[in-house]
Amino acid sequence: MSQVFALITSDSALVRCELDRVRSQFPLEGGSVVGVGGWQDGQVVQQRYGQGAPTEEAWEAPDSEVVMMASRPLGVGEGIEDSSQPFRFRQWLFAAAGSLDRGTEVRDRLREELPEFLAAAVRGPTWEEAAFARYLAELRNIGRIEDPQLDSATAAACLASCAKAIEQVSGLTGVTTRPGFT
């Protein structure tokens, strides 16, 4: 199962101090892939660390006011580039944690419903990446996918709509339990 956390601070110079404070609460397991993302000089920056790679460098986050870190075991045959979070699309970073029954089937169904350019962006085997693309589709539907000033209420409404769509697709694939993701 994935682990995710995001850190927001008022001063990018303080981000490493803040990361040191939470480090013990977010153990990076040796068999997991780790991804770190943030924004530096207005650009999305991202780094991935494969299974068995030293994760000490993961804590050396970019000079950013916002940092997102995700960790999860890598499945058999999965590649680090297509399977590790956070996922990136243009200026967006996205990560999800939790579990989803029949994740591969849900991923495939979600991907079928996406606009072609977003479906092409879903390269990996994870349902989380398809969920991200579905969220981007929600933003696109209201003409805000490129909006750097997207307000939190609109972002939350699109995320809620995305979660509802995932729940509906899960039901169509025969999942009887509610998705357990955050």
Model features per residue range: what roles?
Residues 50-58, 69-90, 107-117:
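Short acidic (Asp/Glu) patches
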Residues 44-45, 141-161:
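Extended, highly charged
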Residues 151-182:
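Catalytic core of PPM/PP2C metal-dependent serine/threonine phosphatase domains
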Residues 2, 93-102:
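Conserved beta-strand-loop-short alpha-helix elements that form
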Residues 38-69, 148-151:
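Short, compositionally biased leader-like segments
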